[in-house]
UniProtKB/Swiss-Prot annotation:
UniProt-recorded name of the protein: Ribose-5-phosphate isomerase A
Active site residues per record: 119
One Pfam family per UniProt: Rib_5-P_isom_A
Disulphide bond pairs: none
Function of the molecule: Catalyzes the reversible conversion of ribose-5-phosphate to ribulose 5-phosphate.
Class of this enzyme: isomerase
Swiss-Prot/TrEMBL keywords: Isomerase
Chain ranges passing through the membrane: none
Reaction catalysed by this enzyme: aldehydo-D-ribose 5-phosphate = D-ribulose 5-phosphate
Involved pathway(s): Carbohydrate degradation; pentose phosphate pathway; D-ribose 5-phosphate from D-ribulose 5-phosphate (non-oxidative stage): step 1/1
Family: Belongs to the ribose 5-phosphate isomerase family.
Amino acid sequence: MARTKKANDEVATDSDSLKLKVAKQAAKLVKDEMVVGLGSGSTANLFIQELGKRVVEEELYIYGVPTSFDSRMMASNSGIPLISLDQCGEIDIAIDGADEVCKKTLSLIKGGGGCHTMEKIVDYHAKEFVVLADEGKLVESLGDKTAVPLEVIPFAYSTVLNKLLDMNTAPAIRSGSGKMGPVITDNGNMIIDVFINIEDAEETETMLNNIPGVLENGIFSKCDKVLVGTSKKVEILKK
C-alpha cells in the first residue's frame, strides 16, 4: 500500500525532532575559546543554530570554520564568528552530519549536499570529529542504501566514469535541481555518485581517491564518536 502524505509528513516530523534533539546535545560539547568545525547539511544546520544561541545568550567565545557556503551563511546568521582554515592553527572539535553510519565501524558516507571535500578537510583536521545522526541513518553494512559521491574535476569526468565502469559499478553524474546540467560544487567540480561494495571503508576510501581526476570521495573512515537521536534519548557510539 502506498504511503499517504500524512504518513510521510509524520515520518519527516519524527526525523526532524530527532535531529533537533541531537543538535542540542552536540552544542553542549563546545567549550569557551574553542575553534569549531561547522559541518554542512540539515542536521549540521540545526547544530549551528543551537550553537549560535549559546554564543548570544552565554557570550560563548568561539570561532567557527565553515565547510560550505551554506554553513557559512547559517553561522553568520546565527551570530557565530568565523575564521578560515589557514587562519587557525588547529580545530578543537568538528561536528557534522552524515547520510549513512555503519554501526559496527562508525565509518560514514557523506556528500549528499556535495560538500564532502571541504567537510573532510575540516573534519579530519580536528582534534575530535563528532557525527550527528538520527537512528534512521544507522546501517549494518556501509553503502548498502547510499551511493558514494565523488567530487571530480570536469576535465577528467569521462575517464573517471570509464574507470568506475571497469570496476563493475554503475556510476551516474549528479544532475542539478533548478538548472539544466550537472551539479557544480563550491569548488567548481562535478559529482559522480556510485554504488560500490565497501568491505573495508579505509581501503575503499583510499582506492577511490587514487583514481586520477577524483578530488575526494564521500567515505569517511575516521570518526571519534557518533551522537544518535532516538525516540527515547541521545545515544553515544564510540570506537
